[in-house]
Amino acid sequence: MANFKVVVSDPKEARAYQIDIKDAEANALIGKSIGDVVDGSIFGLAGYKVQITGGCDGSGFVMKPDLPGPRRQRILTATGVGYVPKLPGQRRRKMMRGKEIAPDIVQVNAKVVEYGSKSIKALLGLETAEEAPAAE
C-alpha cells in the first residue's frame, strides 16, 4: 500500500503543515498530476480544496511538471525544477520523475487554493487552548 507525506502550504498564514496519509487516502492520490486540484478531505481538511504542486520519490528525485507519466527519466535540462546551471547556457542530463503520482512517491507538496469554514490548525488538532476562540 502507498504511504505519503503530504506537505500542505497555506499561503494566507505563510505556514506549511506535514500530514501522513496511508492506504485509502493515499490511493485517492495515485494517478493525479501536478496542477490537479483535489478535495482536502483526503488529508483531513474538510471543506478545503488543495492543488498538487510537486513532490519527490524515495531516492530524492523531484517531480517535473512538464514531464509526462509517472516514471523516472534522464533528461537534458538547462533550467527549471531540479537543476540550477553554474554557467550561462550550461546544460546537464539529470534524472527526474514525471508529473503523475505513483505508489513509489514519498512526499507530495500541495497548496491551499480554496478555504473551508474552520482553520487548518483546528482541523489537524494543532490548536492549543489559549489559541482557540472562547465559546460562550
UniProtKB/Swiss-Prot annotation:
It holds the Pfam family Ribosomal_S6e. The keyword Cell wall biogenesis/degradation does not apply. PROSITE patterns: RIBOSOMAL_S6E (PS00578). One of its GO terms (biological process) is translation. Keywords: Ribonucleoprotein, Ribosomal protein. One of its GO terms (cellular component) is ribonucleoprotein complex. It comes from the Archaea. InterPro entries: Ribosomal_eS6, Ribosomal_eS6_arc, Ribosomal_eS6_CS. One of its GO terms (molecular function) is structural constituent of ribosome. Belongs to the eukaryotic ribosomal protein eS6 family. This is Small ribosomal subunit protein eS6. It comes from Methanosarcina mazei (strain ATCC BAA-159 / DSM 3647 / Goe1 / Go1 / JCM 11833 / OCM 88) (Methanosarcina frisia). The gene is rps6e.
